[in-house]
Design a protein with these regions (language model features):
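Divalent metal-cofactor coordination and adjacent catalytic microenvironments
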Residues: 1-109
Length: 109
């Protein structure tokens, strides 16, 4: 898993388990949103979301870069969705994610 619940809670600065269910749901949504915005195929996402050091599609450096990029994007999306649960502007979020994920979207990584 690219971002664990523990990492997500640390990023959100949540110390208790009271919101674990909400955070898990938002983390799943943030991850899916980033995969969709990056236009990753299931095979590409499987490579990035695994512990592999290389694959048919990516060498080690590319996998590392893709994982770091996706991790930042997922955490950003998670934070946004968590903070704006009531009034999220998904257009603004999507535009920011497109910028963050540009290299993946265009196949540069």
């Amino acid at each position: 898993m690219l971002v664990t619940l523990t990492e997500a809670k640390q990023y959100l600065r949540v110390d208790t388990g009271d919101e674990d269910i909400v955070i898990r749901g938002l983390l799943a949504s943030a991850t899916r949103l980033c995969v969709d915005v990056a236009r990753l195929t299931e095979e590409q996402w499987s490579d990035i979301n695994s512990d592999k050091t290389r694959s048919e599609r990516y060498n080690t450096a590319e996998l590392t870069a893709a994982r770091e990029t996706m991790r930042v994007a997922v955490l950003y999306a998670l934070g946004y969705l968590y903070e704006h649960r009531e009034d999220a502007d998904h257009r603004e979020l999507t535009l920011t994610l497109r910028s963050l994920l540009f290299a993946l979207r265009e196949g540069v990584v």
